[in-house]
Structure formats: structure tokens, C-alpha cells
Design a protein with these regions (language model features):
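Accessory DNA-engaging acidic/polar modules
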Residues: 6-12, 36, 46-47, 107-109, ...
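Short, flexible domain-boundary/linker segments around small modular repeats
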Residues: 1-11, 52-62, 113
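C-terminal charged interaction modules
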Residues: 96-146
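Extended intrinsically disordered, low-complexity coil regions enriched in Ser, Thr, Gly, Ala
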Residues: 28-50, 89-105
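Mid-chain, well-packed structural core segment of small domains
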Residues: 66-103
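Surface loops and adjacent helix of pleckstrin homology
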Residues: 28-30, 37, 82-84, 91, ...
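Conserved loop->alpha-helix
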Residues: 39-41, 48-69, 73-75
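Short, structured motif recognition centered on aromatic/hydrophobic residues
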Residues: 16-18, 23-27, 77-81
């Protein structure tokens, strides 16, 4: 897997990226723990005082699904994940959970949930509560051996 430099500066929030018919969530350590413990993590963006000016997104652990399932509706995205998948991911060094959801005969929605790694060039504050980045460790080892 390829690790990239961080292109965002948000702290302590489930990170969401929407691109090319794909949904990607990144969770910090405490969020992975919360997801495993409570079965849900969520965030919202509020741009005004009315309900129409709010956008929410959530990950939900439920036995109602056997694979990743996304529901997109006005003002919200909810991705459901089987509980055993969540527990295996949260309790191991598995980096992510990935799936595809058929939309029609020619289109699918890619869903990816990842552990958030420390940014290579990030500050201590930006890297708080993240998972160790293997590239940082490799860099440290190569500096020692030179």
C-alpha cells in the first residue's frame, strides 16, 4: 500500500473523502476504538442554522449487512459494516476495510475505511492519536544505518 503526505489539516474528526464514485473514511486511534466499542462513529458539517444546512456522515456496525453498504441521501452518508469485520479490523494491524457496492450493471461505488496514519511531514499536533506510519519508521531505520 502506498502512503501519501497528508493533504488535510483536521484534528480529532473522522475524515471523509468523496472522489470518482468512491467514499473513503479515515479514523484516528480513538475513533477506531469508539467504533469497535459502540458500533458507531459520526461527524457533521454545519453551514447554517437550518436542517438543510447540515451534512452528516457515519459508520455503523450492524448485523443487518454481510458486507459494506453505503446509503447516500440528502444531507447524509451512512456506511454499514458487519460487526465481525469491525472487530477484526480494530483489533489487528489490518490497515483498511474495502468493498464495492453495485449501483447498476455498469457502475459501482467503492467504499474504503482506513486507519489514519501519522503524516510524514506533519506536526506533533496533527499526528496526535494517529497510527504509526511505516514510512516514518523506515526512514528512521535508514538514517541509523547510514
Amino acid at each position: 500500500m502506498h502512503f501519501q503526505k497528508c493533504d488535510y489539516l483536521f484534528d480529532n474528526q473522522v475524515k471523509l473523502r468523496l472522489q470518482h464514485n468512491a467514499i473513503r473514511f479515515r479514523l484516528k486511534r480513538s475513533e477506531v476504538e469508539e467504533f469497535a466499542r459502540t458500533g458507531r462513529v459520526e461527524e457533521k458539517i454545519i453551514s447554517g442554522s437550518s436542517v438543510n444546512q447540515m451534512f452528516g456522515y457515519a459508520l455503523e456496525s450492524t448485523e443487518k449487512v454481510s458486507s459494506l453498504k453505503a446509503t447516500v441521501r440528502p444531507g447524509a452518508i451512512i456506511v454499514q459494516v458487519p460487526p465481525e469485520t469491525v472487530m477484526r479490523w480494530a483489533s489487528t494491524d489490518q490497515i483498511g476495510i474495502e468493498g464495492e457496492q453495485a449501483v447498476d450493471n455498469q457502475t459501482s461505488l467503492r467504499i474504503l475505511i482506513e486507519k489514519d496514519f501519522a503524516c510524514i511531514d506533519g506536526t506533533d499536533e496533527q499526528n496526535a492519536d494517529t497510527f504509526p506510519n511505516p514510512l516514518i519508521e523506515e526512514r528512521k531505520l535508514s538514517e541509523i544505518s547510514c
